[in-house]
Swiss-Prot record:
This is Large ribosomal subunit protein bL36. Pfam families: Ribosomal_L36. It comes from Acholeplasma laidlawii (strain PG-8A). GO terms for molecular function: structural constituent of ribosome. Keywords: Ribonucleoprotein, Ribosomal protein. The keyword DNA repair does not apply. InterPro entries: Ribosomal_bL36 (IPR000473), Ribosomal_bL36_sp (IPR035977). Belongs to the bacterial ribosomal protein bL36 family. The keyword Cell wall biogenesis/degradation does not apply. One of its GO terms (biological process) is translation.
């Protein structure tokens, strides 16, 4: 999982989720796209 200052969708399969005040991008098909903001 990459930690970035700004997270963006990289493909149509990406889902943006907020958990515990953090923003995550989650992708089940291509796990390389997983990101966390902060």
């Amino acid at each position: 999982m990459k930690v970035k200052a700004s997270v963006k969708k990289r493909s149509a399969d990406d889902i943006i989720v907020r958990r515990k005040g953090r923003v995550y991008v989650i992708n089940k098909k291509n796990r390389r796209h997983n990101q966390r903001q902060g």
